[in-house]
Amino acid sequence: KNLGVTTLPAGLVTSSTGDDTGAWTGTTGTTTTTNGSDQLTIQYTNVTGNKMIDCEGGDVANGDRVVERYFLRQPRTNPTGNAGLVLACDAGRMNSSNVITTPFNGDGNELILNVEQFKIMLGVQKTDGTMSYITPHQYKEPTNTLHNAPIIAVKVGMIVRSDKPLVGDVTPITELTLMGGVNRFAATPKYVRKSYE
């Protein structure tokens, strides 16, 4: 069963292309592909009996309830003027009444540099016990038969590019497929790109 805070502001919940609030495209509203990126928000309780670390490096005491939000944004520093987006994570805490006690609406910690696309699929349990992967938008659609089904897995995909452009007469990759979606890029500047799922 999915537990925890259910009344977060629309901009802080898991979202994908097709949602009313739009796909998450970083704090500037820009993305480097032709498709919008997703945002993943997770909630968990530390039941290990030991101290854990959240995505921003903060201590998570036993019994603490954590909310983490993964999203793309502009980097804090851009000395060359051509920095790509970064995958960032912002962490907060909530109490036993599901009230956020430590806000998590900041710009978070930078985890991975030069991420051009961030996509997620939710693995939900169907009534027959099997699992099916769907987008967050499909999951939140009230007419979908898997609306609010138990989430038992998350599939993550990213397209990452090189830090510096290629030099010389090189034909760049201008199209990559990620989780079934085609992402197109400008032909210049020329970057090495790779998709990960």
Regions found by a protein language model. Name each.
Residues K1-P150, G157, D163-V192:
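N-terminal pilin/flagellin-like segments and related low-complexity appendage regions
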Residues Y196-E197:
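Short, structured beta-strand segments at or near domain termini in extracellular proteins/domains
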